[in-house]
C-alpha cells in the first residue's frame, strides 16, 4: 500500500509501526489507579474487553516505575502451566526454582522478603491474561503473599485480564482474595468524541494534517469499532488498503463498509 497517497509518512494504524500514544480518559484513569496500587502495594485487578488498551496501560506504567524502587516481574498466564508459573516466578525474583511446589512457595516468599527488606525494592508481579488463571492458583495467591509477621503488604500483585475474571473472583470461594483487592478497575471503550480524536492524533503523528476519512467513513468506523482501539486501528488500516486499491485519496463510507466486510465485522 502506498500511504503517501494519503499524505502519510507511514501507516499509523499498523501494530508494528511507530507507536503514537493517544491518552484516552480510560487510559489516564487506568494509569492513575495503577500508580495508586504501586504506592499502597497489595492486590490489584485490571479488566476490560479485548483490545481496550489494558496491555498498553500496564506496559507504560511498569516502564515508568523507578527501577531502584521496584522490581517488575511479568507472567503471561495463557502460556504457562501452574508448575511453570511458580518456577518462572521464583527465577524472575532471583531465586532457584524447584520441581516441588512447597519449595517454590518458600522461595517466592523468601525472595519477596529479601527484595522488600534488604534491597528496599517492591516486587511488582504482573499476571497478564489472568482470565486463564485456574482456581488452584487463585487459592494459592492469598496464602503465598500473606506475611503473618508483617501487617503491611510487601509486593504489588496485579491481575490483568478480560471481564470474566471479575466474575470468577465473585465466586464465594474467592471472597477472601477479593476482599484484599486495593484496586479494581474495568476499562471501557472510547466515546465517539475520543474515537475521532484518536484517529486525528494518529494521522497527525504520521505527518498528515488534512482529512483522510470523510465524515461518513469516520462515522462508520466509530460505529463498527464500538470504542475499541484495536478494532478501530484494524478498520482504519483495512480502509486505507481498500481505498488505495481503488486509487482514492479520500476514504468514503462505501470503502469502510468494504473494509468491515473484509474484517468480518459486518
Regions found by a protein language model. Give the residues of each.
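Conserved alpha-helical scaffold flanking the Walker A/P-loop in AAA+ ATPase domains
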Residues: 33-36, 102-118
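Conserved Walker B catalytic segment
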Residues: 43, 113, 119-159, 172
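Short regulatory helix/loop adjacent to the ATP-binding pocket of P-loop NTPases
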Residues: 62-65, 165-180
